[in-house]
């Protein structure tokens, strides 16, 4: 077994809670779509979590008596998760950076997400160039893929 293989086997993956997410991202309720992030491997991959509750304002009109989380908010949750790990990977405590959504490609929605579901955002980096990142994301509920997309974002330094 090589030294490189041994190092990979002992790699400790990072996690961040809601307080750290709030320190990293400028988003706030009702537009913050991620509650915690685990299995963070630098800016390469992670799993973000969103506890979907009936109290969220979009359920009042989407749809009355049949609450379904809007697909665009699921994609937004993917992007916020990816943005948070990009900023987190840069290190240091810093004020929230502005993260601008650049692209959404190959978005697919497979089944409705409802109050009571726990969304998992599985994000994997596809590419990075200067202050821009591209990720492939899968949103899952109970292990089942409910949405997927490729997202790109730019972090604007202040």
UniProtKB/Swiss-Prot annotation:
The gene is fabZ. GO terms for biological process: fatty acid biosynthetic process; lipid A biosynthetic process. Its EC number is 4.2.1.59. GO terms for molecular function: (3R)-hydroxyacyl-[acyl-carrier-protein] dehydratase activity. This is 3-hydroxyacyl-[acyl-carrier-protein] dehydratase FabZ. Belongs to the thioester dehydratase family. FabZ subfamily. Keywords: Cytoplasm, Lipid A biosynthesis, Lipid biosynthesis, Lipid metabolism, Lyase. It comes from Azorhizobium caulinodans (strain ATCC 43989 / DSM 5975 / JCM 20966 / LMG 6465 / NBRC 14845 / NCIMB 13405 / ORS 571). InterPro entries: FabA_FabZ, FabZ, HotDog_dom_sf. It is found in: Cytoplasm. Its main location: cytoplasm. GO terms for cellular component: cytoplasm; membrane. It catalyses: a (3R)-hydroxyacyl-[ACP] = a (2E)-enoyl-[ACP] + H2O. CDD domains: FabZ (cd01288). Involved in unsaturated fatty acids biosynthesis. Catalyzes the dehydration of short chain beta-hydroxyacyl-ACPs and long chain saturated and unsaturated beta-hydroxyacyl-ACPs. NCBIfam families: fabZ, PRK00006.1. The active site is at 62. It is an enzyme of class 4 (lyase).
């Amino acid at each position: 077994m090589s030294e490189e293989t041994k190092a990979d086997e002992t790699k400790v993956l990072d996690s961040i809670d809601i307080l750290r997410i709030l320190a990293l991202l400028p988003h706030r309720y009702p537009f913050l779509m991620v509650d915690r992030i685990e299995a963070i491997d630098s800016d390469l991959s992670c799993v973000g979590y969103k506890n979907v509750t009936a109290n969220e304002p979009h359920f009042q009109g989407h749809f009355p008596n049949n609450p379904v989380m809007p697909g665009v908010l699921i994609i937004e949750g993917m992007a916020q998760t990816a943005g948070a790990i990009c900023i987190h990977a840069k290190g240091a405590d810093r004020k929230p950076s502005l993260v601008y959504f650049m692209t959404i490609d190959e978005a697919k929605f497979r089944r409705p997400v409802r109050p009571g579901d726990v969304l998992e955002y599985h994000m994997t980096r596809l590419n990075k160039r200067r202050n821009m990142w591209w990720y492939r994301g899968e949103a899952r509920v109970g292990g089942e893929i409910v949405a997927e997309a490729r997202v790109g974002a730019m972090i604007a330094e202040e």
